[in-house]
Amino acid sequence: MAVVLRLSRAGTHKAPFYHVVATDSRNARDGKYIEDVGIYDPTQQPERIELKAERIEHWLKVGATPSQTVAMILKRAKKTAQPAEKKA
């Protein structure tokens, strides 16, 4: 079973938001999933990104591969989570 971290679409017509889920790669986009590991809402300003970092880390250690979009979201979330460096 190849586990993938990818987006599952939810919301209404023209107002989508996405669940970040761990699922078998053969399952449909909005089909059943193993675990819900976060939320991504691109319609809000600024974008709403809520991730369960420890669960995502677990799935990556076990061998799950993130989709291109989820990899981009993870990278963006890491940038915003790091504190800004102070200049002396």
UniProtKB/Swiss-Prot annotation:
Which GO cellular component term is one of those annotated? cytoplasm
Query: What start-end ranges are recorded for coiled-coil regions in this protein?
Result: none
- SUPFAM superfamilies the UniProt entry points to: Ribosomal protein S16
Report the InterPro entries cross-referenced here: Ribosomal_bS16, Ribosomal_bS16_dom_sf
Question: Of which family is this protein a member?
Answer: Belongs to the bacterial ribosomal protein bS16 family.
NCBIfam families under this entry? S16
Q: What is this protein called?
A: Small ribosomal subunit protein bS16
* UniProt organism field: Anaeromyxobacter sp. (strain Fw109-5)
